[in-house]
């Protein structure tokens, strides 16, 4: 009786281990895909930042360059 219980427990553990290995592999693939997507997004962000810095400055003067109002 005890041998059957031990065999059943062993079979259950082996089954759980197999499912866990499959889940870990699926999660690994998902993490890898997300890392690749994040790398692409970082590159796009870098390019957009460079374009923004290279664009012409605004025609609006900064507050330091503005003349104070007449009542000041």
Curated annotation (Swiss-Prot):
A Pfam family recorded for this sequence: SlyX
Family: Belongs to the SlyX family.
Coiled-coil regions listed: none
Polar residues bias: start-end ranges: 55-65
Protein name, per record: Protein SlyX
Taxonomic source organism: Salmonella arizonae (strain ATCC BAA-731 / CDC346-86 / RSK2980)
InterPro entries in the record: SlyX (IPR007236)
Lineage: superkingdom: Bacteria
Region of interest called Disordered, as start-end residue ranges on this chain: 53-72
